Amino acid sequence: MVVPSATTPARQETVVAAAPPAAAASGVVGGGGGVTIATVDMSAERGAVARQVATACAAHGFFRCVGHGVPAAAPVAARLDAATAAFFAMAPAEKQRAGPASPLGYGCRSIGFNGDVGELEYLLLHANPAAVAHRARTIDAMDPSRFSAIVNEYIEAMKKLACEILDLLGEGLGLKDPRYFSKLTTNADSDCLLRINHYPPSCNIHKLDHDDQCNIKSLVSTKASNGGNLMAGGRIGFGEHSDPQILSLLRANDVEGLQVFVPDHEGKEMWVQVPSDPSAIFVNVGDVLQALTNGRLISIRHRVIATACRPRLSTIYFASPPLHARISALPETITASSPRRYRSFTWAEYKTTMYSLRLSHSRLELFKIDDDDSDNASEGKA
């Protein structure tokens, strides 16, 4: 994906206004100032791109990726958007054939198994051809093979881009094996996922008709003054969380809603509204990548606020390791001044922990090593 060039361009940045930080369940308090979100042009000189990717992932764990070769107008993206939009436009009973999400399949409002809800409906698919083909029979009964082909084509494009970004990250960090991260995600048993989220219009603060129906056409309006969970004039589309995997690649239409929790110029963390850009792909560092780099990279907390008068459609590819993969900080990230921060664990163990907790829980904190933990020194040798 990276095309060498003769010159090294200046790093691009997008300055966005800060959204009000969450103060309490009943609402928000105002914030101010501007926050800079890095933009990385993948078509630039490779060495410069590698440094920019590493810097952005260490600073915020998030960046806007352009020049990646998969714009919204590209056939691979346009076909997926059309296919998934057609699915979400179906009658509730038809969509329910692909659900309920457990966790894969079609879901409405419920996120996970512990009571988290959001103003959305979604498809969650395992990113391998056999799994997609199996699920496609319930998503597109008329032509499942066509749906499978569209989804798998998109997955391959995202897998290629994720590997390129991870390899650049390995180079930027100066790892002995720059491809270490990408090899985890391309293993035959890798647990990669594709998620498509559909957020209905919320200009009057709507709520989805739940009861396992998710009837988008019969949205019930509620007054803003009655909404205890309203934030910044909207409702929680997808609650605050970090992604547990290695890396996430998000592409969305031109409807805003994504917010990231990042420090401002004074170091104070606040929620920042990310400007929409259908031509860009937004890259998130996940919990596993934070653990692999011994906390050097940041797994960013983010959320979606449903405030728009038009539907928001977003597609996220999650690059993940195999279930049996042991996650342990790489030796080059452990030093006398930066001892091992997390105990080693398997991806299966981490997923089990994740499914036992609420969405907003800081899962990685449960795997931290105490300062006086005797395993700290011994594990540092691994």
Swiss-Prot record:
Fe cation binds at residues 241, 243, 302. Keywords: Dioxygenase, Iron, Metal-binding, Oxidoreductase. Its EC number is 1.14.11.13. Its cofactor is L-ascorbate; Fe(2+). One of its GO terms (biological process) is response to light stimulus. The keyword Iron applies. This is Gibberellin 2-beta-dioxygenase 1. It comes from Oryza sativa subsp. japonica (Rice). The gene is GA2OX1.
